[in-house]
């Protein structure tokens, strides 16, 4: 073996890394052993030899591992194929339907209500020969600006809603007698009498006008109604749950019962039947014993409960009152409270610390509490006659809670029924239009919210029912207008509280990202790294393939 070949083999074994050095000065030992020029020539020979040997080794390894690499690539490819096939399935199963909605009509619904919600009560003056006074009154009505949402009309012929009866008297006064509007007035000329009649009509209808106005201002951002009547009325709904509860104090050790069925039949059902066309009232009853008594103090040898202690009393009683499972059915509570004998007779005080004669307190948007001073040792049953006066108070409170603000009696006259009918129509239309506007804002603000076909159908039904209600009002058909307005309210509520929309609100896009990231990040990162590695291997194999196809020099 020649010294040159021996030296080459020695350097390959001991100093293999020298062949990769680009600068000759780094090969310090070789330069001083055989000289600079010979070392340079020798290193070039070694470098080509090493590269040739490494390519041979890689080619041999590639040939040996080719089946294994192919299997590895097929396995990796299968993962990507599964992912690509799963994407359409995932998209189909998680994609939400977003139907188009008439946003312009929904956003303009409140202003449309203010424009089209017009009540037109009609009158006829009795004993008006030649209809001269009727024409004068109609002229005055047309000359004066109409009050908000009301357009009074005086007609010459029937049918009309009300009749005006003029009676000569020294004093001016007016009052209702069923559908007759009676005016006692001194003798005047036609022009003066026409102005007087119009003033009396607007004075009679001003409470109704204020009630409708308060409904509109409740949804206004600039005007906030401060009327106590507005704050007292219960939340609007086509149906209510009326809960009659007899709560017996903890000091009463004798069982007390009441003849509630006969009492309801005699004293409460007539009013419920009159209200049936306006709202459905579902009556329930209960008796609760050993109820914690109210806080009482002695005043003039009487036990009294302060007005400031009533909130605590209500909170205490609510523990014993059953709740309705229906969210859209507000509950009106009427509590008859029998205190313990130790604090009887117990009287409730008003805000001025005066004893309330009826011993009953009306609580806004909740109901009322009535205290019954009942000697249990002498009598253990409340007969229907004993409950008569209490039901008179309950009936009056029910009308107040439903929105009839100046109720003189506990019954519902024809005039009060019409008044409440108009009020319910206004409430239904205003609530439905406000719900549509809120729904439009909600859908606009949440682009990922699902809007199924059902919601689209509910919205269209609401708009159609509102239009039909306005048309019925223009024809002065209150019963038909109430039916359409109630349907509009129900459909709007079903659209706003649709289950698909509620779930979307509680599961926004941020929650989806929080769920997907922990699941797919640990899978995708190794797949991505493996993909990059396989790409590098494929590029290296192509390079080796090109080198292998280069012809060797002879």
UniProtKB/Swiss-Prot annotation:
Coiled coil: none
Topological domain ranges for the Cytoplasmic compartment: 1-73, 533-554
Topology feature Lumenal, residues: 95-511
InterPro entries, sorted: PtdIno-glycan_biosynth_class_S (IPR019540)
Domain of life from the UniProt record: Eukaryota
GO BP annotations listed: attachment of GPI anchor to protein; GPI anchor biosynthetic process
GO cellular component assignments: endoplasmic reticulum; GPI-anchor transamidase complex
Pfam families reported in the protein's UniProt record: PIG-S
Membrane topology according to the record: Multi-pass membrane protein
Chain's role: Component of the GPI transamidase complex. Involved in transfer of GPI to proteins.
Family: Belongs to the PIGS family.
Subunit-structure text: Forms a complex with PIG-T homolog, PIG-U homolog and GPI8.
Record's protein name: GPI transamidase component PIG-S homolog
Organism: Schizosaccharomyces pombe (strain 972 / ATCC 24843) (Fission yeast)
Biological classification of the source: Eukaryota, Fungi, Dikarya, Ascomycota, Taphrinomycotina
């Amino acid at each position: 073996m020649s010294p040159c070949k021996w030296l080459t083999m020695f350097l390959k074994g001991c100093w293999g890394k020298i062949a990769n050095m680009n600068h000759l000065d780094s090969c310090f030992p070789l330069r001083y052993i055989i000289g600079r020029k010979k070392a340079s020539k020798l290193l070039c020979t070694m470098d080509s030899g090493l590269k040739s040997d490494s390519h041979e080794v890689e080619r041999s390894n590639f040939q040996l591992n080719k089946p294994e690499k192919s299997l590895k690539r097929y396995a990796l490819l299968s993962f990507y194929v599964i992912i690509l096939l799963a994407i359409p399935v995932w998209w189909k199963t998680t994609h939400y339907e977003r139907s188009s909605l008439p946003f312009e009509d929904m956003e303009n619904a409140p202003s449309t209500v203010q424009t089209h919600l017009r009540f037109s009560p009609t009158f006829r003056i009795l004993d008006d020969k030649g209809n001269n006074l009727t024409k004068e009154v109609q002229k005055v009505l047309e000359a004066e600006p109409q009050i908000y949402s009301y357009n009074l009309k005086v007609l010459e012929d029937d049918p009309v809603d009300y009749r005006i009866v003029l009676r000569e008297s020294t004093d001016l006064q007016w009052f209702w007698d069923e559908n007759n509007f009676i005016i006692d007035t001194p003798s005047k000329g036609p022009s003066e009498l026409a102005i007087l009649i119009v003033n009396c009509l607007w004075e009679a209808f001003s409470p109704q006008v204020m009630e409708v106005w308060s409904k509109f201002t409740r949804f206004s951002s600039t005007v906030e109604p401060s009327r106590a009547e507005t704050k007292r009325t219960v939340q609007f709904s086509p149906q209510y749950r009326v809960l009659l509860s007899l709560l017996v104090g903890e000091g009463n050790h004798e069982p007390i019962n009441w003849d509630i069925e006969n009492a309801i039949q005699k004293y409460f059902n007539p009013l419920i039947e009159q209200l049936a066309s306006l709202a459905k009232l579902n009556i329930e009853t209960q008796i609760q014993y050993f109820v914690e008594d109210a806080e009482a103090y002695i005043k003039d040898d009487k036990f009294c409960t302060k007005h400031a202690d009533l909130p605590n009393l209500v909170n205490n009683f609510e523990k014993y009152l059953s709740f309705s499972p229906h969210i859209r059915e507000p509950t009106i509570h009427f509590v008859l409270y029998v205190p313990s004998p130790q604090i009887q007779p117990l009287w409730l005080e008003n805000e001025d610390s005066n004893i309330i004669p009826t011993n009953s307190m009306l609580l806004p948007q909740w109901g009322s509490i009535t205290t019954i001073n009942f000697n249990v040792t002498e009598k253990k049953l409340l007969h229907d006659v004993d409950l008569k006066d209490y039901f008179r108070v309950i009936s009056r409170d029910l009308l107040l809670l439903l929105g009839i603000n100046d109720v003189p009696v506990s019954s519902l006259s024809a005039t009060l029924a019409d008044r409440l009918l108009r009020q319910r129509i206004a409430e239904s239309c205003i609530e439905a239009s406000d719900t549509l506007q809120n729904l439009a804002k909600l859908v606009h603000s949440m682009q990922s919210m699902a809007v199924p076909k059902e919601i689209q159908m509910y919205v269209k039904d609401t708009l159609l029912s509102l239009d039909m209600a306005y048309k019925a009002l223009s024809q002065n058909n209150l019963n038909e207008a109430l039916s359409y307005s109630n349907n509009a309210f129900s459909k709007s509520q079903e659209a706003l509280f649709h289950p698909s929309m509620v779930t979307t609100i509680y599961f926004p896009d941020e929650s989806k990202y929080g769920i997907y990231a922990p699941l797919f990040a640990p899978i995708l990162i190794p797949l991505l790294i493996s993909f990059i590695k396989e790409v590098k291997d494929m590029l290296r194999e192509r390079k080796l393939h090109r080198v292998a196809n280069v012809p060797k020099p002879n």
